[in-house]
């Protein structure tokens, strides 16, 4: 590395928990390669703070879901973005790194780029799945894209956007062979007997929309598979409190709610019922049969449907290029349908063996030592800025 010894300053923004995870991974890699005096600041979550990150605003101020739901938060988000832009232009950091949250970060990245500050974006938006027109915005805003998936650089190259495939940090973190027995011991679950992990989301709006349906599906599954046990991770005390009325309404369920530890809960399971999102990739890396579902408000769903290109929304299916696990979305996500599909995933041993092969191949493809690759790409951008590449 040819960077000078004077203090480097890197501004970063992560807008939600999954971005906090990715940014923390990147910070770890950067701290191994950049001088100890390097300052990292902007907007981040708890994982970033653990790396000494200086967050000037609370990350949850940016965490929204869906077009309609975001309307009430727009004024505050715009205020924060305006203040951040002014701070960047005044302090002129050595680079700005936006981690996911493209609707927020692209505007900041364009302002940085226009001012001669290198702009790096970590996580290519799913332009290959929906809202493909965003690639024009990417070309205007981003100097370098860090891609989680192997097919993304070719798409960006056609638009003239420099990029690096870095793999996914979850593939580095998760072992190729999950320890189901050890996870059950850790959670106090029986070593034998079927266990289903249920993950209805982490936001109030998600729990409100799909939580009752998931709990009704669990009740049906317990009727049809009397020995089954359920495990449900609650990421925060607030989420556990949000789930409690649903738990109280179904006292017959053999349900264990864990404080966080979602990966341990999924590892302990034989099958998973899960809301669409990054957690579905985690489930695939754990080699678990699953059913993917979501419900969003009607108007949000209509907008998403009209701007989509692929017939699937779950990351395991997108990466496989075909339906390898079932998806039940919107009005198709009834308790009966979810119960039937999840029990099929639980009981079908031939399908389980096939999924293990598919997910192992996927795991190996994504296991790239992401923290190192992403950090090295950032260092190259910094070197290029200083004319020493």
Swiss-Prot record:
User: SUPFAM superfamilies annotated for this entry?
Assistant: UDP-Glycosyltransferase/glycogen phosphorylase
Catalyses: a lipid X + a UDP-2-N,3-O-bis[(3R)-3-hydroxyacyl]-alpha-D-glucosamine = a lipid A disaccharide + UDP + H(+)
**Entry-linked InterPro entries:** Glyco_trans_19
Top enzyme class of this protein? transferase
Record-level Gene Ontology MF annotations: lipid-A-disaccharide synthase activity; phospholipid binding
Q: Which GO terms describe its biological process?
A: lipid A biosynthetic process
Q: Keywords in alphabetical order, please.
A: Glycosyltransferase, Lipid A biosynthesis, Lipid biosynthesis, Lipid metabolism, Transferase
One Pfam family in the UniProt entry: LpxB
Q: Which domain of life is it from?
A: Bacteria
Q: In which pathway does it act?
A: Bacterial outer membrane biogenesis; LPS lipid A biosynthesis
The EC designation for this entry is 2.4.1.182
- A cellular component term, taken from the record's GO annotations: membrane
Q: Which family does it belong to?
A: Belongs to the LpxB family.
The record's HAMAP family line, in alphabetical order, gives: LpxB (MF_00392)
Q: What does this protein do?
A: Condensation of UDP-2,3-diacylglucosamine and 2,3-diacylglucosamine-1-phosphate to form lipid A disaccharide, a precursor of lipid A, a phosphorylated glycolipid that anchors the lipopolysaccharide to the outer membrane of the cell.
Q: PANTHER family, from UniProt? A: LIPID-A-DISACCHARIDE SYNTHASE, LIPID-A-DISACCHARIDE SYNTHASE, MITOCHONDRIAL-RELATED
Write the protein's name.
Lipid-A-disaccharide synthase
The organism's taxonomy opens as: Bacteria, Pseudomonadati, Pseudomonadota, Betaproteobacteria, Burkholderiales
State the gene name recorded for this protein.
lpxB
């Amino acid at each position: 590395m040819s960077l000078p010894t004077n203090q480097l300053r890197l501004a970063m923004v992560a807008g939600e928990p999954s971005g906090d995870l990715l940014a923390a991974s990147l910070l770890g890699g950067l701290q191994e390669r950049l001088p100890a005096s390097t300052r990292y600041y902007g907007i981040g979550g708890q994982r970033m703070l653990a790396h000494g990150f200086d967050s000037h605003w609370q990350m949850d101020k940016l965490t929204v879901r869906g077009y309609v739901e975001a309307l009430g938060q727009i004024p505050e988000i715009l205020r924060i973005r305006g203040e951040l832009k002014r701070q960047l232009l005044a302090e002129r950091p050595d680079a700005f790194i936006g981690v996911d949250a493209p609707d927020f970060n692209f505007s900041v990245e364009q302002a940085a780029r226009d001012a001669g500050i290198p702009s790096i974006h970590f996580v290519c938006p799913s332009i290959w799945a929906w809202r493909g027109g965003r690639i024009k915005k990417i070309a205007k805003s981003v100097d370098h894209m860090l891609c989680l998936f192997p097919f993304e650089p070719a798409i960006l190259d056609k638009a003239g956007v420099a990029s690096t495939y870095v793999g996914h940090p979850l593939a580095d973190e998760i072992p190729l062979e999950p320890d189901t027995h050890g996870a059950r011991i850790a959670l106090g679950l029986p070593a034998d007997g079927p266990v289903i992990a249920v993950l209805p989301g982490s936001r109030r709006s998600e729990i409100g929309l799909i939580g009752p349906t998931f709990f009704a599906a669990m009740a049906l599954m317990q009727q049809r598979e009397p020995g089954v046990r359920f495990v449900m991770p609650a990421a925060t005390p607030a989420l556990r409190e949000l789930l409690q009325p649903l738990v109280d309404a179904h006292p017959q369920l053999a349900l264990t709610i864990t404080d966080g530890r979602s990966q341990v809960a999924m590892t302990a399971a034989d099958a998973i019922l899960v809301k669409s999102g990054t957690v579905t990739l985690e489930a695939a890396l754990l080699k678990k049969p699953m059913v993917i579902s979501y419900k969003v408000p009607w108007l949000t769903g209509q907008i998403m449907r009209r701007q989509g290109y692929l017939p699937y929304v779950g990351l395991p299916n997108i990466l496989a290029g075909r339906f390898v696990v079932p998806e039940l979305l919107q009005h198709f996500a009834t308790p009966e349908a979810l119960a039937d599909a999840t029990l099929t995933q639980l009981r079908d041993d031939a399908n389980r063996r096939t999924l293990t092969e598919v997910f192992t191949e996927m795991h190996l493809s994504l296991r790239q030592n992401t923290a190192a690759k992403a950090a090295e790409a950032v260092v190259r951008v910094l070197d290029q800025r200083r004319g020493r590449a």
